[in-house]
Regions:
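Ligand-binding pocket scaffold of soluble enzyme catalytic domains
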Residues: 69
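Short S/T/G/P-rich N-terminal loop/turn motif that feeds into the first structured element of a domain
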Residues: 1-65, 79-80, 103-133
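An amphipathic, aromatic/His-enriched active-site/gating alpha helix that lines ligand/cofactor pockets
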Residues: 75-104
């Protein structure tokens, strides 16, 4: 299992943070390389996005499963990130890449730490399941 946590912009005086966790099972080995390339592009986008406090990535390459956990200073900035490139392209392509169980969940937190146990627990009742082919 590979895991990475990155602090982008500490939360300072912010009282409530917006957290989003995703589980991204990839349905075929042929999509792994394109997915990893896209992940690197989106990671660069994350590091330059205002309003992001921190993010974490987790990978179980053997089972083609990937997780993300992002912590945002305000919910409003998330939409700008999601609809900007390259993330917007990743969303379009994910309908082809997604395996069974791909989902995300949102919640608010006062500490906004990268807590994988909490994220995994919350993903048991996701906000949204991606439709798979």
């Amino acid at each position: 299992m590979v895991e990475r946590k990155v602090e982008v912009d500490g939360n300072g005086e912010i009282q409530e943070l917006h957290c989003i966790a995703t589980i991204l099972p990839i349905r075929s080995w042929r999509y792994i390389i394109p997915f990893l390339r896209m992940t690197a592009r989106v990671q660069k986008q994350l590091e330059h996005t205002r309003g992001l406090a921190r993010y974490g990535l987790k990978a179980d390459l053997l089972h083609k499963r990937f997780w993300t956990l992002t912590v945002w200073q305000k919910k409003e900035v998330v939409q700008g990130f999601v609809t900007s490139e390259p993330h917007a392209e990743a969303v379009r392509r994910f309908k082809d890449w997604a395996g069974e169980g791909a989902a995300f969940v949102e919640w608010t937190s006062t500490n906004g730490t990268i807590d994988w146990n909490t994220a995994m627990q919350k993903l048991q009742n996701p906000t949204f399941y991606y439709k798979t082919k």
